Amino acid sequence: MKYLCVYYQIIRKVFWNMKTFLFQGDSITDANRDDENNDNFGMGCGYAFLLASEFERNNKGKIKFINRGKSGDRITDVYARIKEDIINLKPDFMSILIGVNDVSHELTMNCGVSPEKFKKIYGMLIEEIRESLPEIKIIILEPFILKGSCTEKLWEEFNAEVRKLAEISKQVAEISDLDFVPLQDKFDKISSDGDTRYWSVDGIHPTSAGHQVIKEELHKVIENYI
């Protein structure tokens, strides 16, 4: 199935001149997608689905969206998938939302990724993608955190560490001259009344309303390309 998908991307570019947008990240991007059927349920039920629905509806035959977010992924896991789930798909545009698992896995299972390693691997990821796909446009989304059932017991640690990776994500974008989509301040503002559960199920995973917020912020950047 995956080989057919790669072949389809090549045919699409050569004969139809259709652009491809790739979503990459962890469970927030994955959003329960069906990884065996990307044309139907493969977008999941999150911000990737919301964004793809709008742009594909208004740009028929011009752009195709693919979701390769994977639940549980850290930056090291995305890097490990660089060939199969990024380069081989030959996307023209790509967004990445990663970082919260690098923190949560460390705090809860002692198998996360340190800020120093996060920055190094993120930089390597961007560099190697550009070496293979020099024309690609990459957008980095800021990892974010809210207080919820998954984060409240270690809230100070979660909050501090995720914000460190958020700043590093911004630095990686600046160093590589990439578009950066800030999200933490947005979620802080809209949840300032203390009702974080309206925006996030557990402090990590967005609700439908939370996914809509991510979609709207990413939309502001993508509309400059499409």
PLM regions with names:
Residues 53-61, 77-226:
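Alpha-helical cap/lid subdomain in secreted, periplasmic
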